[in-house]
């Protein structure tokens, strides 16, 4: 007598602590083995792209902080670059260095959270406690520069909102001296840890060809052996003046992606040090009064400055009729902004290309044939944040 084997359907999330947000995965299980994984997204959809259409270019910046809210300034960077390309604005070198420095701080913020929570998902508690301590220091730097720990609203078309406060550059420099020791300590806990390796080596393997077919970017494609990094291949701001290496994996598994993130943190520290050494006094935003607000002291003394300020904050600046795509190397991968302007002070359309969206699409391919307990390990190595996936 033949027996028909029935698979079991299991809901993973949306309230599971390892789902990293509001992911709902419908898993089809044959015993402990995952036969199929069906991600259901949209539980954090806020209509960001539509909301941006009703805001001026300056008012739209905070929406980008709320996409990948682990490293907010990296998204603002893409939007600022898109406007600058259409308006053909030259950004002062000091502003470029400040922007690159804070983008690399964002990369460390994102990677340290991912590496430590991935370890937490497979049972290692200590790294996350150490990691959050370092993230606290970095968020204090964010707060001192922009006034906000998380949603910075700091980058502007033509530069940054305000200059670095007194003593911040020195404190960031001191952090760069002490942080590599923390990375070494994390590696001591995890890299040669037998349990951590058993949970990550040969799990969620992605070949070079499949990584390209699924349009992976960032660590997901570099972990599979493709040395693709927009900071090198399509440099923006002052990245071509900086020296750094691109860590590349061999096997394309969860462990290689973890190693890539660890090495990228070291490279980010090196980039921040270079930015600090190159930084000299100078303007921190475009001097065009039609785009950048005047300094506060000028508003009290000059009628022209007062008019510029009033027009900028009521009507906003007009952007020439054009369309453009700009992409930056965000911590999760290629974050792109496709901006269409119709000559008014509000975008006609702003399409956002979130890297996490492409990575989550491959969840079924990545987890098929693995055990149920491997789902959090694979999901952790994808580095998903739902602000940008659901938009």
Curated annotation (Swiss-Prot):
NDH-1 shuttles electrons from NADH, via FMN and iron-sulfur (Fe-S) centers, to quinones in the respiratory chain. The immediate electron acceptor for the enzyme in this species is believed to be ubiquinone. Couples the redox reaction to proton translocation (for every two electrons transferred, four hydrogen ions are translocated across the cytoplasmic membrane), and thus conserves the redox energy in a proton gradient. It comes from Pelagibacter ubique (strain HTCC1062). GO terms for cellular component: plasma membrane. It catalyses: a quinone + NADH + 5 H(+)(in) = a quinol + NAD(+) + 4 H(+)(out). Keywords: Cell inner membrane, Cell membrane, Membrane, NAD, Quinone, Translocase, Transport, Ubiquinone. NCBIfam families: NuoD (TIGR01962), PRK06075.1 (NF004739). Belongs to the complex I 49 kDa subunit family. HAMAP family: NDH1_NuoD. PROSITE patterns: COMPLEX1_49K. Its EC number is 7.1.1.-. This is NADH-quinone oxidoreductase subunit D. It is a peripheral membrane protein. It comes from the Bacteria. GO terms for molecular function: NAD binding; NADH:ubiquinone reductase (non-electrogenic) activity; quinone binding. It is found in: Cell inner membrane. Signal peptide: none annotated. NDH-1 is composed of 14 different subunits. Subunits NuoB, C, D, E, F, and G constitute the peripheral sector of the complex. SUPFAM superfamilies: HydB/Nqo4-like.
């Amino acid at each position: 007598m033949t027996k028909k084997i029935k698979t079991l359907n299991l809901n993973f999330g949306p309230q599971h602590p390892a789902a990293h947000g509001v992911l709902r995965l419908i898993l089809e299980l044959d015993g402990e083995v995952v036969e199929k994984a069906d991600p259901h997204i949209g539980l954090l959809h806020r209509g960001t792209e539509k909301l941006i259409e009703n805001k001026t270019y300056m008012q739209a910046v905070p929406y980008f902080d709320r996409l990948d809210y682990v490293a907010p300034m990296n998204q603002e960077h893409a939007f600022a670059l898109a406007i600058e390309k259409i308006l053909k604005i030259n950004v002062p070198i000091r502003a470029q260095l400040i922007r690159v420095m804070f983008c690399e701080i964002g990369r460390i913020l994102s990677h340290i959270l991912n590496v430590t929570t991935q370890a937490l998902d497979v049972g290692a508690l200590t790294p996350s406690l150490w990691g959050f301590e370092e993230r606290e220091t970095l968020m204090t730097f964010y707060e001192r520069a922009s006034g906000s720990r998380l949603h910075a609203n700091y980058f502007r078309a033509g530069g940054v909102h305000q200059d670095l406060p007194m003593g911040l550059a020195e404190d960031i420099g001191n952090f760069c001296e002490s942080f590599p020791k923390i990375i070494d300590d994390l590696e001591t806990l995890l890299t040669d840890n037998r349990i951590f390796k058993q949970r990550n080596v040969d799990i969620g393997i992605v070949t070079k060809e499949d990584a390209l077919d699924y349009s992976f970017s960032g660590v997901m494609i570099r972990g599979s052996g493709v040395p693709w990094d927009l900071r090198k291949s399509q440099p923006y701001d002052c990245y071509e003046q900086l020296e750094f290496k691109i860590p590349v994996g061999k096997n394309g598994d969860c462990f290689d992606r973890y190693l890539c993130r660890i090495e990228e943190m070291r490279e980010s520290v090196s980039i921040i040090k270079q930015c600090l050494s190159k930084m000299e006094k100078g303007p921190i935003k475009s001097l065009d009064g039609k785009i950048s607000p005047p300094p506060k002291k000028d508003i009290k003394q000059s009628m022209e400055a007062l008019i510029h300020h009033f027009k900028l904050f009521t009507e906003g600046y007009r952007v020439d009729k054009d369309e453009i795509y700009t992409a930056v190397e965000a911590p999760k991968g290629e974050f792109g902004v496709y901006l269409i302007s119709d000559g008014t002070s509000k975008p006609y359309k702003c399409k956002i290309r979130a890297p996490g969206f492409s990575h989550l699409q491959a969840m079924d391919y990545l987890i098929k044939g693995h055990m149920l307990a491997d789902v959090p390990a694979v999901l952790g190595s994808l580095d998903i944040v739902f602000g940008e996936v659901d938009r």
